């Protein structure tokens, strides 16, 4: 076995931005879930369930199964080692994949914003647009509400780090 070639982020402000988004639930439609809700250290960065509970859930790990949240139809993948370049596809159905041509194929298609430079980055954005995971049963105005949340809660240092990602 060879060790994975996982690289630590070069820019600590970018790492702080990722940590900020990972831990905060304001990106979910009803503010009930964050990335950290389902990627728990005590369960090897999964939730410990065969299928997770998304928006509307309460508690962590198996306690979420007792809540009235929405059941998500796929399991939570671990995040350990996923930064290695050998991981070129994500999700069991291959929803996000780095092609031989260097293009990252995903449901975002040609609308993928600039700044996503690997399959893991694209895969990490997928839950944010999934109704059962983050979005919830909102209205057509949900996108505007999310924009307002970002405007209201964005930290200055996080904004600076985000701007470093945009060419």
Say what each PLM segment does.
Residues 1-167:
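Periplasmic c-type cytochrome electron-transfer domains
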